[in-house]
């Protein structure tokens, strides 16, 4: 077989494959740029959402939790927690109660620390998590349970 496979053929395969995959890359980039405006909910971003993201970052929530698949996997995914915990009517009261109850002190379980957040900070965090739950992630991450 080595007699029929020449350097010229190897060069053609290399350059042809490079051009092919570069064109695939360009096509995927174009597709992403075209669909991105449909997937984002940037127009719904409020001051409360921005403040909630600051609370998220300042308390290093991503050090334990993941958000839309990014972050640590020590604690549950929070990208869809707004939907999992009942939506508009029940989410804020749930989050307030959950944050006040920490740490739960259940033996043998991971413990979330008490951050001593103000009512406003918890409300802002709730708005941030609500906003992230409305991003069209094309069903990513696949774990719906958190």
From Swiss-Prot:
Major location (coarse): membrane
Keywords carried by this UniProt record: Cell membrane, Electron transport, Heme, Iron, Membrane, Metal-binding, Respiratory chain, Signal-anchor, Transmembrane, Transmembrane helix, Transport
InterPro entries: Cyt_c-like_dom, Cyt_c-like_dom_sf, Cytochrome_c550/c551-like
Induction data: By nitric oxide.
Transmembrane segment boundaries: 13-29
GO molecular function list: electron transfer activity; heme binding; metal ion binding
Bilayer topology annotation: Single-pass membrane protein
Cysteine disulfide links: none
Protein origin, superkingdom: Bacteria
Gene Ontology terms: cellular component: plasma membrane
Localisation per UniProt entry: Cell membrane
Residues holding heme c: 61, 64-65
PANTHER family reported in the protein's UniProt record: CYTOCHROME C-553-LIKE
Assembly mode: Heterodimer of cytochromes b (large subunit) and c (small subunit).
Functional note: Component of the anaerobic respiratory chain that transforms nitrate to dinitrogen (denitrification).
Name of this protein: Nitric oxide reductase subunit C
Organism of origin: Stutzerimonas stutzeri
Gene: norC
